[in-house]
């Protein structure tokens, strides 16, 4: 009888062992043991795996293995350490684990209008930069092109081969050689048929909308479009040269903090000690007034991964240059082939902020 009992126990052990090694539905390649106790063998994520992050938003443990247990998502977790889909004020102001999901007014993560529209708590603007078949056939704002990968932008990657929508509209050519087309966003059309805002576009030979980027006392007191600042020299933009000393109108643009009604910055940018919006150490470091951790990541920040697919540097800052993405990079270390939503926002802002050298001096 004892011999039979031992045989039964042995068979149960074998069956249980096989079951525990079977893949878990929805997490192919990960068995029950792996997900709960951790996988043995070579690291599959984190520092020792070139900053790779786990699939399906699994946590990356201190030892570089993917799973959902406390051992993975607790102390030492390297990335994606929050695995549930709740967010917002009732959940420690947590943002959503997927980089492009909005947090709804009820604290759920998603990418529908119910999540990203009225009452949205965080990451509400990011979804605006996704488009196409995987995003409800949404078109891009401001007539931007929708790339084959579903990103909004103006480069050849967006408007060229594979472009899904508005592929012709955001053309940077204009004037008599292009059907007398005018430029988008009230940009000037240069003598040679290109759109821009500097004196080379808006000055001698300009074909259309030649004064739209000018403002102030020398231009009939005109204010800038999109609430941009009007510089001392009568140019529209958002830099300190526009909004600082000598600014003529809309001078609070891109300002934030205690001296500006405790205003927070758009797109989750940090508010510096001096009240300027930005994302570098000068804005998010010492003296930062609000949204100071949005661009922090890695082991010292609960294994947070960077928004918009940016790299997490060895020091826990988000960025997209070699300094962030190479030696010591903690997560998302391979740069995307397409610009991130933020880079698109900043590119457009940079375009609007361009000032002719002679005007600045």
UniProtKB/Swiss-Prot annotation:
Residues cleaved off as propeptide: 27-41, 337-361
Membrane listed as a keyword: no
Organism: Phytolacca americana
Alphabetical UniProt keywords: Chitin-binding, Disulfide bond, Glycoprotein, Lectin, Mitogen, Repeat, Signal
Its job: N-acetyl-D-glucosamine binding lectin. Has high hemagglutinating activity towards human erythrocytes. Shows potent mitogenic activity towards human peripheral blood lymphocytes.
Annotated InterPro entries: Chitin-bd_1, Chitin-binding_1_CS, Endochitinase-like_sf
Organism ancestry: Eukaryota, Viridiplantae, Streptophyta, Embryophyta, Tracheophyta
Signal peptide: 1-26
GO biological process: positive regulation of cell division; positive regulation of mitotic nuclear division
Ranges for domain Chitin-binding type-1: 42-83, 84-127, 128-170, 171-211, 212-252, 253-293, 294-335
Disulfide linkage: 45-60, 54-66, 59-73, 77-81, 87-103, 96-109, 102-116, 120-124, 131-146, 140-152, 145-159, 163-167, 174-189, 183-195, 188-202, 206-210, 215-230, 224-236, 229-243, 247-251, 256-271, 265-277, 270-284, 288-292, 297-312, 306-318, 311-325, 329-333
SMART domains reported for this sequence: ChtBD1 (SM00270)
Pfam families xrefs: Chitin_bind_1 (PF00187)
Protein's name according to its UniProt entry: Lectin-B
């Amino acid at each position: 009888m004892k011999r039979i009992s031992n045989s039964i126990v042995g068979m149960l052990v074998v069956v249980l062992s096989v079951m525990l090694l079977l893949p878990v539905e929805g997490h192919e390649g990960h068995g029950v043991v792996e997900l709960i106790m951790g996988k043995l063998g070579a690291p599959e994520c984190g520092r020792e795996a070139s900053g790779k992050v786990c699939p399906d938003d699994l946590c990356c443990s201190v030892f570089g293995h993917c799973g959902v247990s406390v051992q993975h998502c607790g102390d030492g977790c390297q990335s994606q350490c929050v695995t549930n889909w709740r967010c917002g004020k009732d959940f420690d102001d947590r943002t959503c684990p997927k980089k492009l999901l909005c947090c709804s007014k009820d604290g759920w993560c998603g990418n529908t209008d119910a999540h990203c529209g009225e009452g949205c708590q965080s990451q509400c603007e990011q979804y605006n930069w996704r488009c196409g078949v995987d995003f409800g056939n949404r078109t891009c704002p401001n007539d931007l092109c929708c790339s084959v990968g579903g990103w909004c932008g103006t480069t050849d990657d967006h408007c060229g081969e594979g472009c899904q929508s508005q592929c012709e509209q955001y053309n940077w050519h204009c004037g008599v050689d292009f059907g007398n087309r005018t430029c988008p966003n009230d940009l000037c059309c240069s003598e040679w048929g290109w759109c821009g805002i500097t004196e080379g576009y808006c000055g001698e030979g300009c074909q259309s909308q030649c004064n739209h980027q000018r403002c102030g006392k020398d231009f009939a007191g005109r204010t800038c479009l999109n609430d941009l600042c009007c510089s001392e020299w009568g140019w529209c933009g958002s830099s300190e040269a526009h909004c600082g000393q000598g600014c003529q109108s809309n001078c609070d643009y891109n300002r934030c903090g205690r001296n500006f009604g405790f205003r927070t910055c758009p797109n989750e940018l940090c508010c510096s000690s001096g009240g300027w919006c930005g994302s570098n150490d000068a804005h998010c470091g010492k003296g930062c007034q609000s949204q100071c951790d949005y661009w922090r990541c890695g082991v010292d920040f609960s294994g947070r991964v960077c928004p918009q697919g940016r790299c997490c540097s060895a020091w826990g800052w988000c960025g997209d240059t070699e300094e962030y993405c190479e030696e010591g990079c903690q997560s998302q270390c391979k740069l995307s082939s397409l610009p991130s939503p933020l880079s698109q926002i900043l590119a457009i802002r940079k375009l609007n902020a361009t000032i002719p050298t002679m005007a600045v001096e």
